[in-house]
């Protein structure tokens, strides 16, 4: 089925991993389509949301109606903020877990994004036939683009160019406070205040806002209107020439122009402002003749600046499909050569050729991939009812080096349901909601640390610790927990270690340190002047300092090596929660690194370790390997078949 949203890519190739499911879910309808190849969007169907108890039911109905086989990858644009795994629609009664939905439908990948974020990603690919320019201005290539759209609400987003790709902004800008520009709009604001304590732009220039404007103008003119008049009625009356309806539409478009101008100057949207949503296209020529563009440019000293920025009305029939397709394609391409999808597909292809025991591991991986990722080998073997060597043989049959390699490939493909932004916990959240947000925020912070951690600095820190004569761990307040944990791990290496959480003890001990000694200083803020003075004394005597802290802090700048763990908890007034987890993770990385160094076949190191561990009656290499296993990152002994 050809649509306005279908691109004209000639002879587009089929997706190697099968058709992809695309969805655009609004408060009233859920639209579905299949993308068989890049830009080839077919089988578009629309389902009323009220007819299905859950989103999963609606998707299953579509897949049944479309008469297709397996779908591996799916992406959904939804008219709702997406802030973690749990999604509760504000303008519909659907509530769901992204991960639970993925499992229920058997998808390898399920992305759920805000509908205006998806629409924003479609903008660079729109042709002249899929948009109409309103007024003058010339868009500047590779510049920021703004997007707004009145529908049930007032959606807002933007696109920022970054090298050869675009970054979409998630935004709730429609909730910015409405500011009237003339006496008529003052009257509208006063009328709206009777109903809403906070009157946002969304209240007056989304679809329902036209009704508020209409009723405010009717009250001004002392006209009686029917109680059931809605936006569709007002638009119909305006097209028929009704004076009050025409004035309401004119006022609506003027307010929309003000908001569009605000968005343009806020984003610096020299690439243009695009208008989507379901309301404006229904206005037709009424919008073209409206004061929208004049109000857009009416920014006083910035009038010339706004005059150069073009405004466009999106006319493509299903533009959200284009955007959500682009987001899904980028997500899949960012994975390690598509390794995750290849693993799932290879499991399915090889399943019948596997032994019955290996087949049980395959079924566990397909149906419960996160269990494979998170569980140790002993639990995986127990859940699949096989031996541990069977699990290893299964992994190697897929071309993986072992269980760790298999877990990595599997995990890479499942990050689509893990939010990479901080989710706010709100009063009234249920335990399910706030529990998921706390876990999601922590997982997100760890994944971002993995992406941005300077591993050259990690290697340097491990070398310093491995060669240290003595290691002291300093942490004040909440950071003392991390220091004590580090001491507990590192004393197993036979290196003299101690942890101090008291500033006076730190000062007294640091004064005795010298060349060959190391201080690991853990601090969220990295700014405590007393701690900095203590470290200066030790460094002047020849000791080295490894800092686990935020970037660009005085501590990070002073340290011999800085391991930077930036995160959302940047205000010193906030209790360290995520930061503490990141600091503990850094200690684990350093401990595992030192264990690996000490297990290496180095004669001089082995001799030193042997002397240090003579009391335990174990060789240095064996002891270091034991410590690695003790740290839960070694290989457990294999059970026999």
Swiss-Prot record:
GO MF, any single term: D-glucose binding
**Which residues belong to any copy of the HTH rpiR-type domain?**
341-417
Q: Which residues bind ATP?
A: 23-28
The superkingdom listed in its UniProt entry is Bacteria
What transmembrane ranges does the database entry give? 576-596
EC number of the protein: 2.7.1.2
SUPFAM superfamilies linked: Actin-like ATPase domain (SSF53067), Homeodomain-like (SSF46689), SIS domain (SSF53697)
Please state what the protein is called: Bifunctional protein glk
Record the organism.
Answer: Burkholderia pseudomallei (strain 1710b)
> Which UniProt key words apply to this protein?
ATP-binding, DNA-binding, Glycolysis, Kinase, Membrane, Multifunctional enzyme, Nucleotide-binding, Transcription, Transcription regulation, Transferase, Transmembrane, Transmembrane helix
């Amino acid at each position: 089925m050809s649509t306005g949203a279908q691109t004209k890519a000639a002879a587009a190739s089929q997706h190697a991993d099968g058709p992809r499911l695309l969805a655009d879910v609004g408060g009233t309808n859920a639209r579905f389509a299949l993308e068989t190849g890049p830009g080839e969007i077919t089988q578009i169907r629309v389902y009323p949301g009220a007819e299905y108890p859950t989103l999963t039911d609606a998707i299953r109905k579509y897949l049944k109606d479309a008469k297709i086989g397996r779908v591996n990858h799916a992406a959904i644009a939804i008219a709702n903020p997406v802030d973690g795994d749990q999604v509760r629609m504000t303008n519909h009664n659907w509530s769901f877990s992204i991960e639970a939905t993925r499992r229920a439908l058997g998808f390898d990948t399920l992305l759920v994004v805000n509908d205006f974020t998806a629409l924003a990603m479609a903008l660079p690919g729109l042709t002249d036939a899929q948009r109409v320019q309103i007024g003058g201005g010339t868009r500047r290539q590779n510049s920021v683009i703004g997007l707004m759209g009145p529908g049930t609400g007032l959606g807002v987003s933007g696109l920022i160019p970054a090298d050869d790709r675009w970054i979409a902004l998630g935004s709730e800008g429609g909730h910015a406070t409405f500011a009237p520009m003339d006496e008529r709009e003052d009257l509208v604001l006063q009328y709206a205040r009777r109903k809403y304590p906070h009157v946002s732009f969304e209240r007056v220039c989304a679809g329902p806002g036209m009704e508020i404007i209409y009723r405010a103008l009717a009250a001004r003119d002392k006209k009686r209107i029917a109680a059931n008049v809605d936006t569709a009625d007002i638009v119909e009356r305006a097209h028929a020439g009704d004076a009050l309806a025409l004035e309401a539409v004119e006022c609506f478009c003027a307010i929309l122009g003000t908001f569009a101008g605000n968005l343009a100057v806020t984003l610096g949207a020299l690439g243009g402002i695009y208008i989507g949503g379901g309301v404006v296209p229904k206005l037709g020529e009424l919008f073209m003749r409206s004061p929208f563009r004049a109000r857009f440019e009416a920014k006083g000293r910035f009038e010339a600046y706004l005059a150069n920025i073009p405004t466009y009305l999106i006319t493509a029939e299903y533009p959200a499909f284009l955007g959500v397709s682009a987001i899904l394609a980028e997500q899949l391409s960012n994975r390690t050569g598509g390794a995750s999808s290849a693993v799932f597909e290879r499991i399915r292809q090889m399943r019948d050729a596997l032994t019955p025991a290996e087949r049980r591991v395959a079924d566990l991986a397909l149906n419960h991939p996160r269990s494979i990722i998170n569980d140790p080998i002993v639990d995986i073997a127990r859940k699949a009812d096989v031996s541990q060597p069977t699990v290893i043989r299964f992994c190697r049959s897929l071309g993986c080096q072992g269980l760790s390699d298999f877990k990595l490939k599997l995990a890479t493909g499942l990050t689509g349901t893990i939010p990479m932004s901080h989710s706010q916990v709100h009063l009234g959240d249920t335990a399910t909601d706030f529990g998921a947000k706390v876990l999601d925020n922590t997982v997100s912070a760890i994944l971002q640390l993995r992406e941005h951690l300077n591993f050259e600095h990690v290697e340097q820190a491990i070398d310093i610790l491995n060669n240290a004569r003595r290691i002291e761990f300093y942490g004040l307040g909440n950071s003392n927990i991390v220091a004590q944990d580090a001491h507990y791990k590192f004393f197993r290496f036979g290196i003299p270690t101690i942890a101090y959480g008291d500033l006076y003890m730190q000062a007294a001990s640091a004064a005795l340190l010298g060349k060959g000694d190391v201080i690991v200083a853990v601090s969220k803020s990295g700014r405590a002047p007393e701690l900095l003075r203590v470290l200066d004394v030790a460094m002047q005597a020849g000791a080295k300092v490894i800092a686990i802290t935020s970037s660009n802090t005085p501590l990070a700048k002073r340290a011999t090596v800085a391991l930077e763990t930036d995160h959302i908890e940047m205000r010193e007034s906030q209790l360290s929660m995520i930061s503490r987890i990141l600091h503990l993770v850094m200690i684990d990385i350093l401990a595992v690194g030192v264990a690996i160094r000490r297990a290496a076949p180095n004669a001089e190191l082995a001799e030193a370790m042997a002397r240090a561990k003579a009391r335990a009656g174990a060789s240095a290499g064996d002891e270091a390997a034991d410590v690695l296993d003790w740290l839960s990152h070694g290989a457990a002994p294999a059970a026999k078949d």
